[in-house]
From Swiss-Prot:
GO cellular component: cytoplasm; cytosol; nucleoplasm; nucleus
Localization (cell): Cytoplasm; Nucleus
Biased composition (Polar residues): 47-63
Enzyme class: transferase
SUPFAM superfamilies membership: RING/U-box
Listed name of the protein: E3 ubiquitin-protein ligase RNF126
Biological source species: Mus musculus
Principal subcellular localization: cytoplasm
Entry annotated with the keyword Nucleus: yes
Length: 313
């Protein structure tokens, strides 16, 4: 009578961190197909039925993120140390190795001793989150909630003191001052407002009150009305016989329109010439030597007033 083949002993896979039944005859892990396995002592073998406990992977026995591609969690250089540093020794992920549901009272000292011998024999691995067996009912005090994990991540990214060893500055991937960015829905409006406030007090100084009062007042003629001349400030057409103020550049304005402007800026709103005849306009960069056609056209449009002023004199 042929004898039954001996049952393989219980082994521990250091890659999967679970107990397995090795694949014979190569003695490799049936899950990861690696040979980094260790035979367990015989005193923990189930002697009631003489067979090794079932090691078929179930949903509760599977390691967290077992089938997730590890490249999905690839972090920039330096961030991996920060991410794993958050999950320190106080963070423990509850897992259930094979047989934990049926034998929760297994001696924890033997398991710690086995892990210690394994690390001593094969060399210490890089620090990582500890995986310890916990009961299915109730939450361990050291296990944080999902909200706590997210809060730790947010605090670590925002707080400069939480990422001292990244070498990326207190704001991580932001390689400049965070105030240089437009944050939120009104961020762009805030930047435009700041720019306008910076240019509010720029430009030529106010004109002298004596020069403003000395500006001549001329009547609007039929030639002005026929040419469609209008006030450059309020854009209203001049009425026949209306009194307007004439600047040295021959541009005509309503008295109520040009006086408040000259009290703040000593320049013509059209050609940017001051009351002394000096041009206060500045050409944009790269346009040096290029004249403004609007000034010449505006001057030409006001030529009838000049002729009229000459004839009246």
């Amino acid at each position: 009578m042929a004898e039954a083949s001996p049952q393989p002993g219980r082994y521990f896979c250091h890659c999967c961190s679970v107990e397995i039944v090795p694949r014979l005859p190569d003695y490799i892990c049936p899950r990861c197909e690696s040979g980094f396995i260790e035979e367990l002592p015989e005193e923990t073998r189930n002697t009631e039925n003489g067979s090794a406990p079932s090691t078929a992977p179930t949903d509760q026995n599977r390691q967290p993120f077992e089938n997730v591609d590890q490249h999905l969690f690839t972090l920039p250089q330096g961030y991996s140390q920060f991410a794993f540093g958050i999950f320190d020794d106080s963070f423990e992920i509850p897992t259930f190795p094979p047989g934990a549901q049926a034998d929760d009272g297994r001696d924890p000292e033997s398991r710690r001793e086995r892990e210690h011998q394994s690390r001593h024999r094969y060399g210490a691995r890089q620090p990582r989150a500890r995986l310890t067996a916990r009961r299915a009912t109730g939450r361990h005090e050291g296990v944080p909630t999902l909200e706590g994990i997210i809060q730790q991540l947010v605090n670590g990214i925002i707080s400069p003191a939480a990422v001292p060893s990244l070498g990326l500055g207190p704001w991580g991937v932001l390689h400049s001052n965070p105030m240089d960015y437009a944050w939120g829905a009104n961020g762009l409006d805030t930047i435009i407002t700041q720019l306008l406030n910076q240019f509010e007090n720029t430009g030529p100084p106010p004109a002298d009150k004596e020069k403003i009062q000395a500006l001549p007042t001329v009547p609007v003629t039929e030639e002005h009305v026929g040419s469609g001349l209008e006030c450059p400030v309020c854009k209203e057409d001049y009425a026949l016989g209306e009194s307007v103020r004439q600047l040295p550049c021959n541009h005509l304005f309503h008295d109520s329109c040009i006086v408040p402007w000259l009290e703040q800026h000593d320049s013509c709103p059209v050609c940017r010439k001051s009351l002394t005849g000096q041009n206060t306009a500045t050409n944009p960069p790269g346009l040096t030597g290029v004249g403004f056609s609007s000034s010449s056209s505006s001057s030409s449009s006001s030529s009838p007033s000049n002729e009229n002023a000459t004839s009246n004199s």
